[in-house]
Amino acid sequence: MCIRDRPNITLNDGNTIPQLGFGVFQMDPDKTEELVAEALRVGYRHIDTAAIYGNEEGVGRAIAKSGIPREELFVTTKLWNDRQTDAAAALDESLDKLGLEYVDLYLIHWPTPAKGNYVVAWQQLIELQKQGKAKSIGVSNFELEHLDQLELKTDVKPAVNQVEL
């Protein structure tokens, strides 16, 4: 089966996400552009990065050079822990590095409950989605208690809870 033929999953907000994505965690920033370009060449259409990875610029260069129409791509990036009270500025920085006007999925990378800012960050992500800067919003590495707090405080459920296996 060609990677392009793999199905999409419909999220709770109605948007779709490719079932298979290419992640760039721990990828050398100097190699990111080349490796993402190859992933796109073989058919990947979902690229998963994060501000903390330090390689969003390489992802952006590969996307720009690929010639693939933006609407055919799905780009995920993540808000790092120290920016949870400043999600809008953090996303703007990521968008600049990626060379994009929006991301398809913006995630809170970790709940960091000791700081108590993940609900504030979530409220900001809701606004960013309304502004069109993130088509879908979600979380990463959240436990049930954190998810319950988001729903209790905002009535908006994350479209994704990305976890490591």
Model-predicted regions and their roles:
Residues R70-R83, D104-P111, Q162-E164:
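A short, structured active-site edge motif that brings together acidic residues
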Residues A88-I108, E127-Q131, K153:
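CE4/NodB-like, metal-dependent polysaccharide N-deacetylase domain
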Residues P18-D30, T77-T85, P111, K115:
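Active-site mouth loops of central-metabolism enzymes
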Residues Y44, L100-V103, A134, P158:
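A structural motif
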Residues F22, A39, I47, V59, ...:
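Conserved, mostly hydrophobic/aromatic
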Residues M1-I3:
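Short, small-residue-biased leader/transition segments that mark boundaries at the very start
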Residues M27-L40, R83-G99, Y118-V120, E145-D148:
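Short, acidic/polar
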Residues P111-L165:
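Beta/alpha (TIM)-barrel catalytic core signal, keyed to glycine-rich beta->alpha loops juxtaposed to Asp/Glu
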